[in-house]
Curated annotation (Swiss-Prot):
Component of the MCM2-7 complex. The complex forms a toroidal hexameric ring with the proposed subunit order MCM2-MCM6-MCM4-MCM7-MCM3-MCM5. Component of the CMG helicase complex, a hexameric ring of related MCM2-7 subunits stabilized by CDC45 and the tetrameric GINS complex. Associated with the replication-specific DNA polymerase alpha. Interacts with MCMBP. Interacts with ANKRD17. Interacts with MCM3AP isoform MCM3AP; this interaction leads to MCM3 acetylation. Residues 295-502 form the MCM domain. Acts as a component of the MCM2-7 complex (MCM complex) which is the replicative helicase essential for 'once per cell cycle' DNA replication initiation and elongation in eukaryotic cells. Core component of CDC45-MCM-GINS (CMG) helicase, the molecular machine that unwinds template DNA during replication, and around which the replisome is built. GO terms for cellular component: CMG complex; MCM complex. The gene is MCM3. This is DNA replication licensing factor MCM3. GO terms for molecular function: ATP binding; ATP hydrolysis activity; single-stranded DNA binding; single-stranded DNA helicase activity.
Length: 808
């Protein structure tokens, strides 16, 4: 505060006169005179002034305003009140004070919470950041009026503290007695209060230095500025930077607390928008028309070019970046347009790398991990302010990523309670808090891209997908697509991957020096609340395709062009704005395919669903088809979009399950060998050959082979051949014998008579054979008895276990 200049009355009046001349610009363009008239008609009391206009008209006064804010703003606000009174005297008397808010170019005083240092104290600064904490709105007394019944006099007292522009704070003692110790009564109707709120602004994650904690600054909002921002909003706050003395035990300590007293709060765009030129728009239109047939495949191939394969996953991530169409119906229902994807698979299949690519490509993305995140850390938390002791709301990762993407790695490491906390966010797109006396609803309209490992560490192909995934159905149904990514052993594919990885390690970007760290920043920041000096000089010509590099893209016979990352960002940004409409043809096709999906699990026995097919799947098909239409820059969702969406869902929802060969049980060595032992061994050899061929073909299809499965080698090891018993031979033969209807009916009648005579629910096989054939004219052979019992067991009429027949 050493640099602060206290103005005397003469200088204050001179400053007030300069500001009044600036506002009274009727002879010039009349901008601020019309603004003041609008302020009166809108019943407002804060005028937004552009610093550039003041600098153009009175540069000396503008510099003083930025460097000695408190006294200059007091003079500016008095001048504003005088100017309002000259236009409408009655309106000027309605409000105690009129406020001035600033905008425009602040140059070196346009800072972030990290660069806001002590040299800016008592200056006007513009701070950018994300609102992370938000206190409750409290009333603060400005003027209290007290009535003394004994003397019948009225006493008035004004209050000011260090958060106001007045240089010296008044006494905070609330009067209860007058000078003669007569009791006073407070006239609450005549007293004046103003709203007061404290928010905390944190620096933006994309601008924070890597490996350092983000810094924050407290901002004080008064009167009409309260509730201008909520947790998760990106804002620019213009205000005066001030230090407040810290007190401990009634004494002022040497450490000071700094706050920003706001005079203007401006909402920034939710997205970090890329800057567009007319040429960029023309290129985007031309690209969408010339590549209209395979534009979706072209864009999907260009996603994460450093990752080999995973074509369907890349298509799904492109759909996630484009998104569907969000709808709010008249009855209050909300249909989300965000697409959620879960990647589950073996280690080292590039799940985390895909997440990192989305972080770099999406306009707004926040990374988090399952082990390092809690449920309230992802949604919102109610915390206690250490200084005031009051409750405040703190936004989590999903609220901060509103209209963006949340990337959650190691999703399986989260606890069930924390995973349950994100259910509402994934479907409704909002967070509802009702705890500690705070009831709030925050927007969290974000897409979720999660990566997880299977339950057993690696994916077991002999178990169903649901057993491998190990997540609740209620959570899985909220993911639009669930991809199972396997590390399969295929010599040809392994050769391609090794070639690809080696090329990536040999590649070096142009101009990269030895040992240089890769730059993490983006384009040049604009040090103003607006971008008035936008020119084409800063714009580089955005190339549609990347220049082909043999190391980066490989030497293929058919050179596939890769869309550049810069053009991809701009194309996705433009495509997201389009809102396609479903055609009748595509709607009918989606409805038919949805009903087919519901019954598809009963068609083939060797496939199983990765996630439940519910009504949400129908919305998934619509969202994916809409995203495909956005990629084509189409205003309608056509049949080809619906077909592509169905193909994605078919690939993601069903996974083949292998059947394990039953291992033979070892029998005792003293059992005699049967005559057909040699034939059996030959059959086994043939079956093994067939199985090996089948598995090799499956591996080529990319569907079944597991590099850690040694079932083939186990079967090829020498095994002890076990002889067949007579019972097993009869059982096999009984499956070949077919009983006639009359013969089966006679057996059932005879069986029922045997159970009635025995007065029991179970009977042995030997006893049954004797009892049935005792009085029978045509006795039943043991093979017929086995066949009849097998038939009755299939019909759930009897149960055979260890030679005992149970009547059901």
């Amino acid at each position: 505060m050493a640099g602060t200049v206290v103005l005397d009355d003469v200088e204050l009046r001179e400053a007030q006169r300069d500001y009044l001349d600036f506002l009274d610009d009727e002879e010039d363009q009349g901008i601020y005179q019309s603004k003041v008239r609008e302020l009166i008609s809108d019943n407002q009391y804060r005028l937004i002034v552009n610093v550039n206009d003041l600098r153009r008209k009175n540069e000396k006064r503008a510099n003083r305003l930025l460097n000695n804010a408190f006294e200059e703003l007091v003079a500016f606000q008095r001048a504003l009140k005088d100017f309002v009174a000259s236009i409408d005297a009655t309106y000027a008397k309605q409000y105690e004070e009129f406020y001035v808010g600033l905008e425009g170019s602040f140059g070196s005083k346009h800072v972030s919470p990290r660069t806001l240092t002590s040299c800016f104290l008592s200056c006007v600064v513009c701070v950018e950041g994300i609102v992370t904490k938000c206190s409750l709105v409290r009333p603060k007394v400005v003027r209290s009026v007290h009535y003394c019944p004994a003397t019948k006099k009225t006493i008035e007292r004004r209050y000011s503290d260090l958060t106001t522009l007045v240089a010296f704070p008044s006494s905070s003692v609330y009067p209860t007695k007058d000078e003669e110790n007569n009791p006073l009564e407070t006239e609450y109707g005549l007293s004046v209060y103003k709203d007061h709120q404290t928010i905390t602004i944190q620096e933006m994650p994309e601008k924070a230095p890597a490996g350092q904690l983000p810094r924050s600054v407290d901002v004080i909002l008064d009167d009409d500025l309260v509730d201008k921002a909520k947790p998760g909003d990106r804002v620019q706050v213009v205000g005066t930077y001030r230090c407040l003395p810290g007190k401990k035990g009634g004494y002022t300590s040497g450490t000071f607390r700094t706050v920003l007293i706001a005079c203007n709060v401006k909402q920034m765009s939710k997205d970090a928008q890329p800057s567009f030129s007319a040429e960029d728009i023309a290129k985007i239109k031309k690209f969408s028309k010339t590549r209209s047939k395979d534009i979706f495949d072209q864009l999907a191939r260009s996603l994460a070019p450093s990752i080999h394969g995973h074509d369907y996953v890349k298509k799904a991530i492109l759909c996630l970046l484009l998104g569907g169409v969000e709808r709010d119906l008249e009855n209050g229902s909300h249909i989300r347009g965000d697409i959620n994807i879960l990647l589950i698979g073996d280690p080292s299949v590039a799940k985390s790398q895909l997440l990192r690519y989305v972080l770099c490509t999406a306009p707004r993305a926040i990374p988090t991990t399952g082990r390092g995140s809690s449920g309230v850390g992802l949604t919102a938390a109610v915390t206690t302010d250490q200084e005031t002791g009051e409750r405040r709301l703190e936004a989590g990762a999903m609220v901060l990523a509103d209209r963006g993407v949340v990337c959650i790695d190691e999703f399986d490491k989260m606890s069930d309670m924390d995973r349950t906390a994100i259910h509402e966010v994934m479907e409704q797109g909002r967070v509802t808090i009702a705890k500690a006396g705070i009831h709030a609803r925050l927007n969290a309209r974000c897409s979720v891209l999660a990566a997880a490992n299977p339950v057993y560490g690696r994916y077991d192909q002999y178990k169903t997908p649901m057993e491998n995934i190990g997540l609740q159905d209620s959570l899985l149904s909220r993911f639009d697509l669930l991809f199972i990514m396997l590390d399969q052993m295929d010599p040809e594919q392994d050769r391609e991957i090794s070639d690809h990885v080696l090329r990536m390690h040999r590649y070096r970007a142009p101009g990269e020096q030895d040992g240089d760290a890769m730059p993490l920043g983006s384009a040049v920041d604009i040090l103003a609340t607006d971008d008035p000096n936008f020119s084409q000089e800063d714009q580089q010509d955005t190339q549609i395709y990347e220049k082909h590099d043999n190391l980066l893209h490989g030497t293929k016979k058919k050179k596939e062009k890769m869309v550049s990352a810069a053009f991809m960002k701009k194309y996705i940004h433009v495509a997201k704005i389009i809102k396609p409409v479903l055609t009748q043809e595509s709607a009918t096709y989606i409805a038919e395919e949805y009903s087919r999906l519901r019954s598809q699990d009963s068609m083939s026995s060797d496939t199983a669903r990765t996630s439940p097919v519910t009504a949400r799947t129908l919305e998934t098909l619509i969202r994916l088809a809409t995203a495909h239409a956005k990629a084509r820059m189409s205003k309608t969702v056509d049949l080809q979009d619906a077909e592509e969406a169905v193909e994605l869902v078919q690939y993601a929802y069903f996974k083949k399950v292998l059947e394990k060969e039953k291992k033979r049980k070892k029998r005792s060595e003293d059992e005699s060998e049967t005559e057909d032992e040699e034939e059996k061994s030959q059959e086994d050899q043939e079956q093994k050959r067939k199985r090996r061929k089948t598995r090799q073909s499956d591996a080529k299809d990319g569907d079944s082979y597991d590099p850690y499965d040694f079932s083939d080698t186990e079967e090829e090891m020498p095994q002890v051949h076990t002889p067949k018993t007579a019972d097993s031979q009869e059982t096999k033969e009984s499956q070949k014998v077919e009983l006639s209807e009359s013969r089966l009916k006679a057996f059932k009648v005879a069986l029922l008579d045997v159970f009635r005579e025995a007065h029991a629910q179970s009977i042995g096989m030997n006893r049954l054979t004797e009892s049935i054939n005792r009085d029978s004219e045509e006795p039943f052979s043991s093979v017929e008895i086995q066949a009849a019992l097998s038939k009755m067991q299939d019909d759930n009429q009897v149960m055979v276990s260890e030679g005992i027949i149970f009547l059901i």
